[in-house]
Amino acid sequence: MNATTSLAALAFAVLLAGQAAAQSETTTLPNGMDITPDYQEYGRWYNAEGIPTYKFDDEGAIDFATFNGYRRYSAECHVCHGPDGEGSTYAPALKESVLRMDYYDFQQVVASGKQEVNTAQNQVMPAFGTNKNVWCYIDDIYAYLLARGTDDLPRGRPAKKGPKSDEFREQEDSCMSM
């Protein structure tokens, strides 16, 4: 095999490896939470403590709920928090916030809003607890932000997604019809 063929084969192997994304080796966040997927319920993945997380399949597709979190984040959150959880000049990077904050604190802030006023800043986040497009998908949004925060999921629309399960669809219909 000549050098050109070897280089082409190496480049092809690297390309294939990049297409099949995988869970990162880091499973414990700075806040101490283990993000290893343990079980699935209503089409969503959770860790052993019942906290939403994400999972890639063997072909590198992200689970549907996390993909849905991308969609809901893009529709409801990115206006203030920037695309892909990266933050903006007036709102924090949520992909970093979820690595440090407790899931239940995240829920509380999303549901009730938050205001931080001091000499350096005046940050106000409105409450989204009554917005079904956010609250029915809070676990999905959280899982998406975790995947972004750990850099397991690159910027932009996820390239591959798992199927939407009947269980997910039923739970979604139930929540949206309340």
Locate the predicted segments by residue:
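Sequence context surrounding c-type heme c attachment/ligation sites in exported
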Residues: Y70-H78, G87, R100-Q107, W135, ...
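Post-cleavage N-terminal segment of exported redox proteins
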Residues: N2-T5, F12-F64, Y144-K160, K164-M178
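Short acidic/polar micro-motifs centered on Gly/Asp/Asn
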Residues: F56-D57, G82-G87
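Sequence/structural segment immediately N-terminal to covalent heme-attachment motifs in c-type
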Residues: I62-P83, A111-S112
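Axial heme c-ligation environment in periplasmic c-type cytochrome domains
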Residues: S24-L29, S88-K95, G113-D140, L145-S165
